[in-house]
Structure formats: structure tokens, C-alpha cells
Swiss-Prot record:
UniProt name for this protein: Conotoxin Qc5.2
A GO cellular component entry from the record: extracellular region
Positions where Valine amide occurs in the chain: V60
Domain remark text: The cysteine framework is V (CC-CC).
Organism: Conus quercinus
Subcellular localization(s) per the UniProt record: Secreted
Amino acid sequence: MRCVPVFIILLLLSPSAPSVDAHPMTKDDVPQASLHDDAKRTLQVPWMKRGCCAMLTCCVGR
């Protein structure tokens, strides 16, 4: 039971994310790539270098 007040105080002290973007996007801003886009790009590069498809059916004869 001693942990509950400490946990509540820590929750109150933690900063919350703003509900609105603090800096409005301008025409010079470039959208950031998401983690999903980075992972997808990383996984696609080896397939392109080998010339194989994702199902490995076209790699069988090589």
C-alpha cells in the first residue's frame, strides 16, 4: 500500500503529450519517416540486391 501514493505522485509529475502540435507545419518542413517506413525500407534493400521476391519462389533456381 505504500507504493500507491508514490505511483500517483510520479504519474502527476510526468509530462503529458500536448494534444495539439506546438509548431504549425510550414512549407519548408519535411515530414519525418516513421519507424515502420524505416523497417520496411531496410527489409526491402536485401531483396532488391539479390533479385528475389518475397515468397522465395523465384530464388529456388538460382
